[in-house]
């Protein structure tokens, strides 16, 4: 837009995509602490009945079965965010970027690829956008409950929005330029919150529109926020609600 040359550019979230820890272990329901999760993906925990997993799942009969880690073989924003999460949440993860290290487990291409692999391999585990895990539920794929510090949390609309309640943003020139502080998000441990999420952004000029264009831009973003429908949910995205939705609407109102 020509107006952006004379105005600040705002980033704001439109959809929130939670990342599931998806696994294939028959009917066994699994809880994993962030520390245990990091050790699994580093290859330090190799069996499902490892004492660390047993400590996270008291009273559960865990199988003496090999863990097969499945990772994204292609470059991916999900891999970049998951590695940021492991570093922030555990303090013990050295790799970063869109390429996941290929030192442990097996690679698969794309979100559907890793979900397929987990469905096909008994004992497999991966990180994947929630919707792809849901699509494989009928093939034995389950989502682990993650203990971020206050007990195991199930991935749900409620737990993701709980994480969004205390979302921190990076220091910018405007409160309406909403760039998420992912390090603060991933290391947060609010009770009942699921902070392992991907945020996607729209980029928009903050001002400089003529009256008609301003109305169109505001109308577009208002419609996006007001119609977070079942179709989004089917693709694994979570509708934004509550206080965070109010902040996003205020940012739309501030456009000039």
Task: Specify the residue positions occupied by each region the protein language model found.
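Single conserved hydrophobic/aromatic residue that forms the stacking wall/gate
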Residues: 1-6, 10
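A conserved helix-loop-strand patch within extracytoplasmic ligand-binding domains
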Residues: 8, 15-70, 74
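Second-shell loop/turn segments in exported
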Residues: 8, 23-28, 66-72, 101-105, ...
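Extracellular/periplasmic juxtamembrane helices and adjacent flexible linkers that interface
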Residues: 58-65, 176-179, 183-256
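Ligand-binding pocket segment of bilobal, Venus flytrap-like solute-binding proteins
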Residues: 75-170
């Amino acid at each position: 837009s020509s107006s952006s040359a004379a105005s600040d550019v705002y980033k704001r979230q439109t959809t929130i995509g939670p990342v599931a820890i998806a696994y294939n272990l028959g009917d066994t329901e699994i809880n994993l602490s962030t520390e245990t999760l990091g050790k699994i993906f580093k290859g330090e925990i190799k069996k499902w009945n490892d004492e660390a997993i047993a400590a996270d799942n008291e009273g559960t009969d865990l199988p003496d079965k090999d863990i097969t880690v499945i990772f994204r073989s292609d470059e991916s924003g999900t891999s970049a965010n998951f590695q940021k999460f492991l570093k922030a949440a555990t303090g013990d993860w050295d790799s970063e970027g869109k390429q996941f290290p290929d030192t442990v487990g097996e690679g698969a291409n794309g979100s559907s690829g890793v979900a397929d692999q987990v469905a096909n391999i008994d004992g497999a585990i991966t990180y994947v956008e929630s919707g792809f895990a849901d699509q494989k539920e009928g093939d034995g794929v389950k989502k682990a409950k993650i203990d971020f510090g206050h007990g195991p949390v199930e991935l749900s609309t409620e737990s993701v929005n709980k994480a969004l309640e205390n979302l921190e943003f990076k220091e910018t020139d405007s409160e309406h330029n909403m760039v998420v502080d992912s390090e603060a998000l991933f290391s947060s441990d609010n009770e009942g919150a699921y902070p392992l999420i991907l945020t996607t952004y729209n980029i928009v000029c903050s001002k400089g529109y003529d009256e008609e264009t301003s109305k169109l831009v505001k109308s577009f973003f208002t419609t996006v926020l007001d119609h977070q429908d079942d179709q989004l949910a089917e693709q694994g995205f979570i509708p934004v609600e509550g206080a965070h939705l109010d902040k996003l609407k205020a940012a739309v109102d501030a456009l000039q």
